[in-house]
């Protein structure tokens, strides 16, 4: 699949039609991907889902439940629900610690394999940081050495994209502003299986002001100028508890933070977001998630 194809391309003609921007949520899956995760998503009215396939704060690489995997995959296909996996937070290919890098390789390989098993379109991974006081160029060379081989392993038609998620700019972040993706993509040879997951809270906290009449569109223009058309595959739709440029990753419910509602509406009118799902990672449990999903749908449809 070429990078300029829609992230939702390939849906069969008998499946329900997709809205321009499916709106969904990260969902809990303890107890079963299908029996718990998709049930939660349906309760929200979610049109897209994101899941963990391992403890996000650990290195375990558990095997899946084949029955749950197949039921989840089949239901997502039948109902045209695009699914995504979020890799564990500990992954950092820029670490100065060899053990962390080795564990990062195995953890991400596991997430990519599990993504394929459940029919996920993409696996989201944070872009990491240059630890140990090392220069960014040294860390990016290490990213290339260890991450590019994992991308080259994605040889099946149903393998997921690897979606780089820039961070909020804390510490020695390798990638937070849109233009930071340029060296990152270059280090990975702009691999055809490489995409971007844009987190609105992160990019706002990193210094891109999404507010105002053209803030969201200018940010997306910069993204496209940096990585090219068709690379944006997923948006994490989160408001921010903190002001622009605060370098703090603290999510708020849609419209309840410093971003506000209007930028989310604007995001869903830019050419780069056509066909790109929005997934919330906001506070509030099921009730708060349902409210955020409904609010984003209204912003999209009105």
Task: Show which residues each predicted segment covers.
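N-terminal pre-domain/capping segments
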Residues: 1-87, 91-112
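Short, well-ordered coil/turn segments that N-cap beta-strands
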Residues: 17-23, 45-47, 77-83, 117-121, ...
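Active-site beta-loop-alpha junctions enriched in small/polar residues
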Residues: 26-30, 54-56, 88-90, 128-130, ...
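Conserved, mostly hydrophobic/aromatic
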Residues: 41, 86, 104, 115, ...
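Acidic/histidine-rich catalytic cores of soluble enzymes
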Residues: 49, 145-254
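Alpha-helix-loop-beta-strand connector modules within alpha/beta enzyme cores
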Residues: 66-85, 143-157, 184-188, 258-270
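Active-site acidic/histidine proton-transfer and metal-coordination neighborhood
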Residues: 77, 93-195
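Short, electropositive alpha-helical surface patch
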Residues: 99-112, 135-148, 177-186, 214-221, ...
């Amino acid at each position: 699949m070429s990078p300029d194809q829609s992230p939702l391309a390939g849906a069969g003609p008998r499946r329900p039609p997709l809205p321009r921007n499916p709106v969904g949520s990260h969902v809990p899956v303890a107890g079963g991907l299908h029996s718990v995760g998709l049930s939660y998503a349906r309760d929200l009215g979610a049109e897209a889902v994101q899941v963990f396939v391992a403890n996000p704060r650990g290195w375990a690489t558990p095997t899946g439940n084949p029955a749950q995997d197949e039921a989840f995959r089949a239901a997502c296909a039948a109902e045209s629900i695009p699914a995504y996996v979020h890799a564990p937070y500990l992954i950092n290919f820029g670490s100065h610690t060899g053990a962390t890098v080795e564990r990062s390789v195995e953890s991400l390989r596991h997430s990519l394999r599990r993504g394929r098993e459940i029919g996920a379109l993409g696996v989201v991974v944070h872009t990491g940081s240059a630890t140990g006081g090392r220069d960014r160029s040294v860390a990016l060379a290490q990213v290339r050495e260890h991450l590019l081989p994992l991308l080259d392993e994605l040889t099946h038609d149903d393998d997921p994209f690897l979606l780089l998620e820039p961070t909020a700019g804390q510490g020695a972040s390798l990638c937070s502003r849109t233009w930071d993706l340029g060296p990152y993509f270059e280090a990975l040879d702009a691999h055809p299986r490489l995409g971007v997951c844009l987190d609105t809270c992160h990019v706002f906290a990193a210094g891109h002001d999404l507010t105002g009449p053209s803030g969201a569109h200018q940010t997306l223009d910069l993204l496209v100028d940096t990585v090219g058309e068709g690379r944006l595959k997923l948006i994490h739709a989160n408001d921010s508890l903190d002001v622009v440029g605060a370098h703090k990753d603290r999510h708020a419910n849609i419209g309840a933070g410093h971003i506000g509602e209007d930028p989310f509406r604007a995001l869903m009118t830019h050419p780069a977001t056509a066909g790109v799902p929005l997934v919330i990672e906001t506070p509030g449990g099921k009730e708060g998630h349902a409210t955020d999903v409904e609010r984003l749908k209204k912003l999209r449809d009105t």
